[in-house]
């Protein structure tokens, strides 16, 4: 097995130790971004749209440095990185309403022809040098507004790493990460089945919880961790008692739901297989005359390593839309928790861990019965 290109911290006191990201954290992020954009997307596919309601892949290569440069320019009062016309085409992507694609918020103009890859990479290089210069001058830590812009840029790039990865999963041409060997999915499935436990309901008591950040978002400070608009203001809310499952809905549980209800559509993360165990490219399902076992054998799950037979992914959390997951949760006797309910679950689990370090409940709860 090859070691990952970098190791990202999992605890807040580690990955958010200071309100301003370190230059080392930037280098780690840039190496990961470069791996995904330059080694997992073939150059000839940069103009492709794996998700039709999104921009082409090349947009994101220009959007990340351009949007960040705009925020640094606002924060520092400096000059834009050239070419400045990138601001016109890379500031904001398209994000139409899924149910009515005609409803689209304002977005950057889409050019008849995107800039060349070399132009975009040169702009990215200049932007990264601008970031390095800010740290070298001490401005990153001495100027509060600049520090906030740096954190905004870090989170924005991380979020779009996720955007690109779920876009690549919808493509037929994505390349696997070059720094990791393909997992033995059959062995992983066997181990998961051997160690499987029942997905129990847990009682979560009523409690009052805090939601949101105390972040005034002003250049005068005080120095606090950056928060997006939806994370503010801080407030308290009372959450009623409920029962919650101990882990996410799995592919196996979702397969039972689809088979039992005769749903005609599969989640976008699945693929049907043809008789020769190949992908047939049709996102539909029929279960007339099929056994549940045959239904499962005829499906695959999209991964960055290519399709993996569903029978090897039954214990994975299912990736599906809210409506799809909520339908399954209702079939299982519950529903999807609200934001406040999910936060209440996390609060309760954290309290249990502090009282009983040896006892661990699931981190993510898929269904609520209350």
Where are these regions (language model features)?
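N-terminal regions that are enriched for targeting/export leaders
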Residues: 2-46, 50-53, 135
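Flexible inter-domain linker/hinge segments
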Residues: 172-209, 215, 220
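Acidic/His metal-coordination segments adjacent to aromatic residues that form catalytic metal sites
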Residues: 104-117, 141-142, 310
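Hydrophobic helix-coil surface modules that form long, contiguous segments used
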Residues: 199, 206, 210-212, 216, ...
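Short, well-ordered surface patches within globular domains
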Residues: 151, 161, 167-177, 251-252, ...
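Short aromatic-cysteine micro-motif
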Residues: 116-128, 227-253, 261, 297-353
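Core domains of carbohydrate- and sulfate-ester-processing enzymes
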Residues: 82-103, 198, 205-207, 266-278, ...
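Short, contiguous alpha-helical
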Residues: 2-3, 24, 43-102, 137-192, ...
């Amino acid at each position: 097995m090859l070691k990952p290109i970098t190791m990202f911290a999992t605890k807040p006191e580690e990955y958010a130790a200071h309100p301003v990201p370190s230059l080392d954290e930037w280098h780690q992020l840039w190496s990961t971004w470069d791996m995904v954009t330059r080694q997992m997307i073939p150059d000839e596919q940069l103009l492709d749209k794996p998700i039709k309601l999104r921009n082409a892949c090349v947009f994101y290569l220009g959007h990340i440095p351009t949007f960040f440069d705009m925020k640094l320019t606002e924060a520092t009062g400096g000059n834009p990185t050239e070419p400045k016309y990138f601001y016109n085409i890379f500031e904001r992507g398209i994000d139409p309403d899924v149910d009515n694609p005609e409803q689209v918020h304002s977005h950057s103009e889409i050019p008849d022809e995107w800039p060349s890859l070399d132009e975009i990479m040169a702009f990215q290089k200049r932007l990264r040098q601008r970031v390095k210069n800010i740290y070298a001058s001490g401005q990153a830590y001495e100027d509060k507004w600049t520090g906030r812009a740096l954190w905004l840029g870090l989170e924005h790039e991380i979020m779009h790493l996720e955007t690109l990865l779920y876009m690549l999963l919808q493509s037929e041409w994505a390349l696997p990460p070059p720094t990791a060997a393909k997992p033995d999915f059959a062995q992983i499935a066997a181990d998961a089945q051997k160690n499987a436990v029942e997905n129990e309901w847990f009682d979560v008591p009523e409690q009052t919880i805090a939601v949101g950040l105390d972040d005034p978002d002003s250049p005068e400070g005080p120095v606090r961790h950056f928060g997006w608009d939806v994370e503010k203001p801080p407030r308290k809310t009372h959450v009623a008692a409920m029962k919650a499952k101990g882990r996410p809905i799995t592919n196996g549980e979702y397969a039972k739901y689809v088979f039992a209800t005769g749903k005609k559509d599969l989640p976008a993360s699945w693929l049907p297989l043809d008789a020769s165990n190949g992908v047939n490219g049709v996102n539909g399902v029929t279960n007339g005359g099929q056994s549940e076992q045959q239904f499962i054998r005829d499906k695959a799950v999209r991964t960055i390593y290519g399709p993996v037979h569903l029978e090897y992914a039954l214990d994975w959390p299912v990736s599906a839309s809210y409506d799809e997951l909520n339908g399954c949760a209702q079939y299982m006797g519950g529903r999807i928790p609200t934001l406040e309910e999910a936060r209440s679950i996390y609060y309760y689990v954290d309290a249990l861990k502090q009282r009983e370090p040896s006892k661990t409940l699931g981190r993510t709860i898929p269904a609520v019965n209350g």
